[in-house]
Each structure stands twice: as structure tokens, then as C-alpha cells.
């Protein structure tokens, strides 16, 4: 099992840890760049075949990119809550997140940390990744407000770095499998090139990566199987927040990988 931190996440090469190109000087990257860096790592390790590439959210988008970019190495692909081309809705969500973190439109001046987190946390940690049903878990409006305050304080101390968020969300926004060389911007043509058996999973309602986008991607991949995740957690259906969702996903993925 190989788990790789994507470029820009603050652990692999990122604006927050780059010595040569820190902060606003960090170059723009794309999801295809993330996958290419992972391919180079596997070349270095001498790994020629992957039994499966599995990912959720941006990881699911990377999984589909893997299947397009390296069809010889990828033997199976499991993409949870993915998009083959980033939706306008997702781009809007990311833009609102960036405006919460930065004072100026050019994204060169981060807001004061506490101010940024008061705006950023409700949007990115609760409203968008969750669902209206999930919010009913809070006993009262007071409990919800306290959760937001606690989360804002935690993120204010622990992250994210504003420039890391900027780099990754810009990569997110620019993603389109059709931009892979050889497909002339045709997303469906890129999806149709996937030869590995593919399993695509997404909940019915996802306020970050729309469920229709995952379904459309699955329909364009030859022989792909699409499964609707029976979850009320929205985008977090594939993030491990609910034990029942984890058990269901484990069973479906295990069955797929055993074929």
C-alpha cells in the first residue's frame, strides 16, 4: 500500500515549505502535475504495476487522471466523489474560500488568521462538505455556534496555510481530464480512453463535488460501475466520518478489488 501526499498539501512540496519558491512565489500546479510527481516516485521505486489506484474527492480526481495518464500501470481504479472536469459550482465554492483567506483579489495578502478562520471554517468545514441532515446532529443552535468557534480556534492554530489552500484550490479549479495531451480538451474522449476496470462512488447529494459529475464520469468510462453511497453526510460520505459509511465502502471496494 502506497499513500502519497499531494503537492501543495503542506507535507509534500508546497508554498508553506518550499525554500526556493515560498508563499505567493510558488508556481501554479495542476492535478495532472500531482499525478506526474507520483508516477516519478513509482519509477524511482521500480514499481511497474498498481493493483488499484484509490482516492476520494481530489484523490478521486487524481485516480481518474492516473487511469488516463498511465493506462499500462493502472490495473483498477476506485474514484470516490470525483469530477472529471471541475464544475462551476465547485469553482465558486473554492473562490469563496479564497476570499475568506485573502484580503485582496490577487490573493497576495492573507487576512489576519482569526478573521480568516471565522469566515473560512463555516464554509469549508461544515456547510459545503456536510449536509442539512448532518447538521441535525447538533442538539441546539448554541451547540452549533460553539462547534464553529472551537473549529475556528483549532484551524487558527494548526492550519491550513493560506498559500497551500490557494495552490490546491487553483489546481482543483483548473482540472479537466480533457486537457491531458492527446485529447484536445475533450473530457469524454479522455474518459473513454480508460481501459482499467473502474468503480465510481458518490452520494446523491454533494455540495462540493456534485453527484451528477461523478455519474457523468462513470457513464463515459467503458464498463465502469457507478454506486450511489447511501449516506446523509454529503461530500464527507467518503471521508470516514461515519462508521456505517466506512463499512459500506469497505465492502463495496473489497468486492470490486477481488474480481
Locate the predicted segments by residue:
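Conserved alpha/beta-hydrolase
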Residues: 1-16
Amino acid at each position: 500500500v502506497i499513500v502519497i501526499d499531494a503537492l501543495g498539501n503542506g507535507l509534500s512540496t508546497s508554498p508553506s515549505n518550499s525554500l526556493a519558491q515560498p508563499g505567493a512565489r510558488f508556481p501554479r500546479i495542476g492535478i495532472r502535475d500531482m499525478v506526474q510527481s507520483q508516477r516519478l516516485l513509482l519509477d524511482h521505486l521500480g514499481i511497474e504495476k498498481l493493483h488499484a489506484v484509490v482516492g476520494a474527492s481530489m484523490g478521486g480526481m487524481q485516480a481518474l487522471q492516473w487511469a488516463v495518464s498511465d493506462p499500462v500501470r493502472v490495473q483498477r481504479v476506485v474514484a470516490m466523489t470525483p469530477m472529471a472536469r471541475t464544475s462551476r459550482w465547485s469553482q465558486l465554492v473554492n473562490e469563496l474560500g479564497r476570499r475568506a483567506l485573502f484580503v485582496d483579489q490577487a490573493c497576495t495578502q492573507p487576512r489576519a488568521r482569526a478573521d480568516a478562520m471565522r469566515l473560512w471554517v463555516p464554509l469549508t468545514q461544515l456547510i459545503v462538505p456536510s449536509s442539512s441532515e448532518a447538521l441535525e446532529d447538533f442538539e441546539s443552535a448554541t451547540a452549533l455556534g460553539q462547534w464553529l468557534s472551537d473549529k475556528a480556534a483549532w484551524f487558527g492554530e494548526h492550519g491550513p496555510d493560506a498559500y497551500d489552500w490557494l495552490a490546491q484550490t487553483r489546481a482543483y479549479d483548473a482540472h479537466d481530464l480533457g486537457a491531458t495531451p492527446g485529447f484536445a480538451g475533450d473530457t469524454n474522449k479522455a474518459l473513454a480512453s480508460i481501459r482499467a476496470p473502474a468503480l465510481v462512488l458518490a452520494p446523491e447529494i454533494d455540495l462540493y463535488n456534485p453527484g451528477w459529475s461523478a455519474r457523468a464520469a462513470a457513464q463515459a468510462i467503458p464498463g465502469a460501475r457507478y454506486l450511489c453511497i447511501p449516506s446523509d453526510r454529503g461530500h464527507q460520505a467518503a471521508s470516514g466520518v461515519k462508521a456505517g459509511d466506512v463499512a459500506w465502502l469497505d465492502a463495496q471496494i473489497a468486492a470490486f478489488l477481488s474480481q
